[in-house]
Amino acid sequence: MSNATNNTLGSLLPQLEAAANSNSLYGGMVPNLRFNITMIVIWGILLTIHVVQLLMRQYWFSIAFICTGILEVLGFIGRTWSHSNVADMDAFLLNMICLTIAPVFTMGGIYYQLAKLIEVYGHRFSLLPSPMAYSFIFICSDIVSLVVQAVGGGLCGVAVTDGTSTTTGNHVFIAGLAIQVASMAIFLMLWFHFLFRIYISVRWEHINSRPISLSLLKISQTEVDYLYREKFHFLRLEPKRWVFHYFNLAMTVAVLTIFTRCCYRLAELVVGWDGYLITHEWYFIILDALMMAIATVTLTIFHPGFAFKGRSTSIPITPGHVDPETLPHTDDVEDILDTSDSKQFDIEKEEFQASMKYPISTFKQFMSKIANLFSSKKKAKL
């Protein structure tokens, strides 16, 4: 009986110590060591896989997910570190900032895929003036969100170090998350509009009627494929290409899980640093860690490189509401099945360099700010 009591007290000791510590940054909660180490391993594996998947030449998507993987690993290292010292500001900031902004890069990779899907199905399904407008608008929005969140996190860190109020930093951080959530909500509306157009509207067009009936499901994708862009029919119709057939579903799952996670983070900060959500880790495990893991595993299996035949097919993003090959007095933009591997590489390289210029620069600046923040705090201690 005595041994059982001692074991129980021993298991509760970290929680009792944290609750008694007035400097605790988690409101008395101690991050679970086993769970956070497990997440470091899982994200390490996912990060390695996405490095290998760079070979599929979906550069934007893979680099975006690599950035996410790095931030998730760093964030869970911070939570593991916090297990032994819940009052350590460096560990808390590493956890809070990295895990909070990681989805910005995930969504950056996802936004670009909608532009590619519009190219595959046809420009007429785009609600915006150009497929690239989706990427440009939402990636710019994410960059703004990232910068605002980084500034808010930095202000909170400095305030705690100086022993002053974190109210301003917290409000800035919340504003950054609110921008991200609002941007994702608008993207979700545009995403479901696109799905409605390619799955419902084309069937109405095919039967020249607009019934609201389950009978529409009896019309196969093969029957309505003639209403899509002819140039990429080989991507859509090959029967064994299950990765492409379920790619839109995978994208939907990923976006909804990340959106759920971002709403949770926003609510967590609104409630406060010592509120109910941040002091009960199960909310974090289910609504943050699990949501991000589901999204990333889903798009690791249904990788755009597999869906779009990234090693042999180029899908350049072109402007306008009309498919380029249908315009009068114009030649095809390019042969999409190019036998020249070097030409294919050059095309993808140019697209990648153009699209990655600002996000990569922002990511470097952000990581530099984190390093400087930790460095200045350590100097202040000395």
Curated annotation (Swiss-Prot):
Keywords: Cell membrane, Glycoprotein, Lipid transport, Membrane, Transmembrane, Transmembrane helix, Transport. InterPro entries: RTA1. Catalyzes the ATP-dependent translocation of sphingoid long-chain bases (LCBs) from the cytoplasmic site toward the extracytoplasmic side of the membrane (flip-flop). Involved in the establishment of the functional lipid asymmetry of the plasma membrane. Regulates intracellular levels of LCBs, sphingolipid precursors that are growth inhibitory at increased levels. Glycans are attached at residues 3, 6. This is Sphingoid long-chain base transporter RSB1. It comes from Saccharomyces cerevisiae (strain RM11-1a) (Baker's yeast). Residues 56-57, 112-135, 193-241, 303-382 are cytoplasmic. Belongs to the lipid-translocating exporter (LTE) (TC 9.A.26.1) family.
